[in-house]
Amino acid sequence: MSKELLLEIGAEEIPAGFVPKALASLEEMIRKELETARLCFDAIVTMGTPRRLTLHIKGLPVIQPDAELTAMGPSKKAAFDADGKPTKAAEGFARGQGVDVSALQVISTDKGEYLAVTRQETGRPTHELLAEILPRLVAGIPFKKSMRWADLDIRFARPVHWIVALFDGIVVPFSFGPIQSGNISRGHRFMANSTFPVRDFAHYLDECERHFVIVDQERRKETIRKETHRVAKTTGGHLLPDESLLEEVTYLVEYPSAIIGSIPAEFLVVPKEVLITSMRSHQRYFSVVDENGKLLPYFITIPNTLAEDPAVVVRGNERVLRARLSDARFFFDEDRKLRLESRVESLKSVVYQQKLGTSYEKMERFRALAEQLAEQLNPAAKQQAARTAFLCKADLVSGMVGEFPEVQGIMGREYALHDGEETAVANAIAEHYLPTQAGGDLPASDIGAFVSLADKLDTLCGCFGVGLIPTGAADPYALRRATIGMISIILDKGYSLSLSGLIDKSLELLAAKLTRPRDEVRHDVLEFFRGRFVNLQGNAYPADVVEAAMAAGFDDLADCAERIRALDTFRQRDDFQPLTVAFKRVCNIIKEGIDAPVAPALFQDEAEHTLYRVLQETKLSASDKIQQQQYLEALTDIAGLKWAVDAFFDAVMVMAEDSAVRNNRLALLTTINRLFSRIADFGRLAG
């Protein structure tokens, strides 16, 4: 017979960001505890609000199953002396297990024979086990910050006020500090601040809802989503999607509703990004936009109650918002009193990173990189790229960015436009921070792309150059994100450039700052790029295709991506498998190859003449297509070699006794191998 467990930890308001992680930890810990206790179950569900963490487990047995437990001891060799008498190791093991030496068994394992003790353990009542498990569970929930309260020697995110613990409807008795577990829960702090008894999980959910608490976070989230969309439509606009804000607000309320208020028109001169950021960061308000994405003069707030008089709530929120936006308007007006370029000098007093110097030094480095990129890829944009790089960090010392760091770049664009800078430069200032997240928007212009690449590469090479290399999950300088961003930009724009050459230039500019050998840094940065590129391409293509194409070179990322795409497409064709077999036959014969020209005069068989002739024709056509990155067409041409290769192997003995003939045949096969290898190493393909 299986039963259910209900655990509710009731506390003062837990910070919204703590709740999801606490619920995940709660589930992880109980799974481990149940496994250790040999208790199976059907399902685990966790739910949470600002005031409660809830755990529900279905399908627990009433009694722990019996078990045969074996404790392993020392090896037989160490347990007995030459006369077969037990040693101190055997006696100590027996004593530790509470048995006589004569009760010890010898068990054969992969590592040899060892002593062991096997005993039968009778299962204990689950209710009894849970009384031991649950206090560990409550005390073990990790929080980013926890606190003590009163004079208690316990810690939690916020003071705990009640605990519900029921197994099969019966209280599981334990204590957490002065709090005793029971069957009494509590309702909404403001709308139903009273206690109520609980019988089981279904009854608990019903009673919570009757007391204005929606325990299920997914239901609260969906309620907020629907209500915000509904209210936004009443303005003639629609909700600006914001999943992270939705997630946060879900854990700020127990019984959500949605109320709309107005933004005073005087503040609409402030860039919409600032208004949205201010409302989002300080007030947790949702924004409303029209069909073109223009901000409308409304906000949506999610109170934790059903307001008796919504107008009172609106007035209160509008009063607070006016104060917030007045600050933003002040910063906006004050910042525009100084030209953006006049702020650049102030970057000399802003430390970017202790070992890498100031933000001004960083700007000078990546400006030089941006100029090189422009000169190589779009010379007409060189001057604008240099100007963008010079100005793009200047807004970091503005009042607005000091108050709202999220609008860096955006304010640079606004201030540049106000100062009369070229529109292309102003837009590129905002674009150079892109992408801000995986799969996010990329720079639309070459200018923005050049500066973005240069800035990110300086960050990557600089950090690697002074030993700030990501380890495990730790990546304080977001180098993985920066590298993925660079790769995404290069592939999106189709830029053909030498990655190693760009890294060399960056390290040259960083020479005075490096604390590690330049060659080591260069190698590590390239490998870091390789790892990120493999991961990105591996999301879309088979691993062996990616590996095969990269083996032919990945210094030009855009070119490598084209070869991966072509190879994957070609792989779907009927002639792919026979071609791969032919190529592998070539590889198996030549090993390291012969670096010598082919001499037709040494041919002894018509098959050699035929293969050489077909190879010359194929090289001519395929090389031209490879040069134009028409790799699928080039592979089609190369596939035409198969019949001639097969005929060659059928007709001649490659490893002839005559060394000149032998080496000439190897040189012929080496030429074929080099043609294949300009696209991929077919030997790395599976199958």
Swiss-Prot record:
Its main location: cytoplasm. The keyword Ribosomal protein does not apply. One of its GO terms (molecular function) is ATP binding. Its EC number is 6.1.1.14. Keywords: Aminoacyl-tRNA synthetase, ATP-binding, Cytoplasm, Ligase, Nucleotide-binding, Protein biosynthesis. PROSITE patterns: AA_TRNA_LIGASE_II_GLYAB. Tetramer of two alpha and two beta subunits. This is Glycine--tRNA ligase beta subunit. It comes from Trichlorobacter lovleyi (strain ATCC BAA-1151 / DSM 17278 / SZ). The lineage of its organism: Bacteria, Pseudomonadati, Thermodesulfobacteriota, Desulfuromonadia, Geobacterales.
